[in-house]
Amino acid sequence: MPEAIVVGAGVVGASIAFHLAERGIDTLVLDRNGPAGGSTPRSGALVRCHYPTSLEADLAWESLTEYFEPWGERVGGGCGFTRTGFAYLAGEDRVEALRHNVNLQQKVNVQTQLIEPAELGELDHSLNLDGVALAAYEPRGGYADPTATTVGFLDVARRLGARFERRQVTSLRVRGEKIIGVETEGGPLEAGIVVVAAGSWSGPLAASVGLELPIHPVRVQVALFERPYTLPTHLTVIDSVSGFYARPAAERATVIGLRDSYEWLEDAESWDPKPDTDFVDEAAYLLGKRIPDLEGAPYRAGRAGILDMTPDARPILGPEGPEGLYLAVGWSGTGFKKAPAVGNELATWIQDGRPNRPELETYNLNRFNNGDLIFGKYDPAVRSPH
């Protein structure tokens, strides 16, 4: 009988399992698919720290500097992290908020700075900066491989004694006020600690112990376009003026996702994993407008994924409901870049009864009933799964 069961083998669940195993906690990971079999491999996988709250920026900075950059030494193997530099592009209407948020990020030691369009153009000659009034620049930002990151965490967790089983969890099991395990399609499994990290599929599991999660499944899309040989790379950008993010990818490709491509779903089971034609056309147009070298770039591939969206686009994290139950859900498209630090925090919370960062307790479920929703200076950035 394991001490802990983690439900969900995406990047967040994998990070939690890794950190529990590091602490010597006997851990079993369950997922109806294989590792990284849900939304994680469809992630945009940006690694950046530009957030409108200090807690999010701090978690992303720890993930970058203590995990993604030194991955080989800290975890082992490779996560595909590639440093490109990151820029957040703002129009005149967002300049005040941008100044506020960069100052907020700098206070938690994020290496970021405000940069004028002319200077940004010197850093990346491929950018057409029409409509950009000011930018934030993170020289250490970039992207990683979401599947390699997830599998890397799980591989090391297994070497440390954790186990993975491909099983669908159908409900949580309680006795009195305590969690006692999970029910699966193959029968019951016992554990005194259960962590639910199953993304948009978490709601029915929480409901089995009387918890109603305000999570809504949302379909979002990404497209890959082929870069010419004359453009070997470019900055990773979030373009709040045009409403997209873009980053380089391996084999001369560029990944793009759009702000206005959200599709709210009735459930997380019935959705098209292929991108819509209108989405691809709009993505191609916007990408070519901002990076003229990519105008008319050949479309290579595309995919869609599911976000577990909450009303304030912030997660539900920590102990909830019966004793021994922990949630790590509702990431709303921003889980990937913070997953390493979040796994460390939740493992600490489980072992010590409190997280390293007390402000993580604000990510509780009650905030949605109490009107304590968490918002930053401006709306969440363009999102992709995780």
Task: Report residues per predicted region.
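Beta1/beta-strand and adjacent pyrophosphate-binding region of the FAD-binding site
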Residues: 1-12, 28
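C-terminal catalytic lobe of FAD-dependent flavoproteins
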Residues: 146, 285-386
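Active-site lid/adjacent beta-loop-alpha segment flanking the redox-cofactor pocket in flavoenzymes
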Residues: 212-214, 227-324
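Helical element adjacent to the flavin cofactor pocket in flavoenzyme catalytic cores
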Residues: 136-192
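Glycine-rich FAD pyrophosphate-binding loop
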Residues: 21-40
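Short beta-strand to alpha-helix junction loop
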Residues: 58-59, 88-97, 136-155, 272-279
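Central helical "cap/lid" subdomain
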Residues: 37, 187-234, 353
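Dinucleotide-binding Rossmann-like beta1-alpha1 core, especially the glycine-rich loop
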Residues: 44-123, 243-245, 287
